[in-house]
């Protein structure tokens, strides 16, 4: 067996072993069989809320077990084909098998990470806010680099994106933006990215070529679906309209189509100017508000609201989650997990999967 092929096979087998334990395949299969019996009973629908809950559990188990079995079957097929190709010295087929196994190892690693998702909203779409820290043009440029990094990360995962709101910097970059990320498990993949990001580089805006430090923050919160109830009273809202202009609206409005909603009790603010329709912008801003309030409630339940609020509002040294050093050496380091890589170009081009996996694995392991 070729060394490259053997390497990919070992990676996939390791993933399968971890997935077997993580999924508890035998117990999950028994539970799925029990759910199939329960959901086949017509009387189940006498309690629609419970019926929907059981159907969601059944669908989730089916998806995970089917993916596991397909992964296992694809590896078996590839190994059988590899054995025949080796016997016939079929170099073209061996090359194709190597590529297929490489792709399979990527799928296995992604599936392995997704099996660590355990939150109520992990399967939902999400919103990502980026805000430049103090420092003017330097931080504005860093915020725009972060926006591109996350758009590329979403693209790598097969998610769609919509820029809901964006405010440009005076000279370069952006002051802030809100991105809607659309796809199954989007929140699960992005939720660990909330916090402050620090960049060290030679400034492209300084004629003396000085090394500069910039900060920008990101905050991720899930889009709320019908399965999660968030009650918002009209008396608690202040709704303002204004004219959309520049990036985010992609045009200059002559009417007040942009909408800003303030939740008075919490001071939470959302705004949207991505559509020409004030009605659609209001609906999107309300959806974002529901999502933010849900995230705040989840933070309270886990007794981490103070830490999380500080992480998303205070762009300072004390609340960093990750540092990106481009000078005098190249290194991106997650300060929560200590995971690091010298491939700064890859990271800024959206290669964040290992950072997410490391953080999720740390949480499962109970580390702080």
Swiss-Prot record:
Signal peptide limits: none
PROSITE patterns: RF_PROK_I
UniProt KW keywords: Cytoplasm, Methylation, Protein biosynthesis
Pfam entry (one): PCRF
UniProt cross-references to InterPro entries, sorted A to Z: PCRF, Pep_chain_release_fac_I, Pep_chain_release_fac_I_sf, PrfB
GO terms, molecular function: translation release factor activity, codon specific
Membrane-spanning parts: none
Modified residues (N5-methylglutamine): 250
Source domain of life: Bacteria
Cell compartments where the protein resides: Cytoplasm
SMART domains in alphabetical order: PCRF
Post-translational modification, as annotated: Methylated by PrmC. Methylation increases the termination efficiency of RF2.
Cellular component per GO, a single term: cytoplasm
Assigned protein family: Belongs to the prokaryotic/mitochondrial release factor family.
UniProt xrefs under HAMAP family: Rel_fac_2 (MF_00094)
PANTHER family: CLASS I PEPTIDE CHAIN RELEASE FACTOR, PEPTIDE CHAIN RELEASE FACTOR 2
Described purpose of this protein according to its UniProt entry: Peptide chain release factor 2 directs the termination of translation in response to the peptide chain termination codons UGA and UAA.
Protein name: Peptide chain release factor 2
UniProt gene name: prfB
């Amino acid at each position: 067996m070729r060394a490259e092929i053997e390497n990919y096979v070992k990676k996939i087998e390791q993933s399968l072993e971890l997935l077997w334990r993580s999924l508890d395949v035998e117990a999950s299969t028994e539970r799925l069989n029990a759910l199939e019996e329960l959901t086949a009973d017509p009387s189940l629908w006498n309690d629609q809320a419970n019926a929907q809950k059981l159907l969601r559990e059944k669908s989730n188990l089916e998806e995970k077990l089917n993916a596991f079995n397909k992964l296992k079957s694809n590896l078996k097929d590839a190994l059988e084909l590899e054995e025949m190709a080796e016997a016939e010295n079929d170099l073209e087929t061996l090359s194709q098998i190597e590529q297929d196994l490489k792709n399979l190892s990527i799928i296995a690693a992604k599936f392995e990470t997704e099996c660590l998702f355990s939150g109520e909203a992990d399967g939902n779409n999400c919103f990502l806010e980026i805000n430049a820290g103090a420092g003017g043009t330097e931080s504005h440029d860093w915020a725009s680099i972060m926006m591109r990094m996350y758009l590329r990360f979403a693209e790598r995962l097969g998610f769609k994106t919509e820029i809901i709101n964006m405010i440009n910097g005076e000279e370069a970059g952006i002051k802030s933006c809100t991105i809607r990320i659309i796809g199954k498990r989007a929140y699960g993949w992005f939720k660990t990215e909330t916090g402050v990001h620090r960049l060290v580089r030679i400034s492209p805006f300084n004629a003396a070529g000085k090394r500069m430090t910039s900060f920008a923050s990101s905050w991720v919160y899930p889009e709320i679906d019908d399965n999660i109830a968030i009650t918002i009273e009209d008396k608690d809202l202040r709704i303002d309209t204004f004219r959309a202009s520049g990036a985010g609206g992609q045009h200059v409005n002559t009417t007040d189509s942009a909408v800003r909603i303030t939740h008075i009790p919490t001071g939470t603010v959302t705004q949207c100017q991505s559509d020409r329709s004030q009605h659609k912008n209001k609906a999107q801003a309300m959806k974002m508000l529901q999502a933010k309030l849900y995230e705040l409630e989840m933070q309270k339940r886990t007794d981490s609201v103070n830490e999380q609020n500080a992480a998303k509002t205070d762009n300072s040294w004390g609340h960093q989650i990750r540092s990106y050093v481009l000078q005098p050496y190249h290194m991106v380091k997650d300060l929560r997990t200590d995971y690091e890589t010298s491939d700064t170009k890859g990271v800024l081009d959206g290669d964040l999967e290992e950072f997410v996996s490391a953080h999720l694995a740390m949480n499962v392991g109970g580390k702080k």
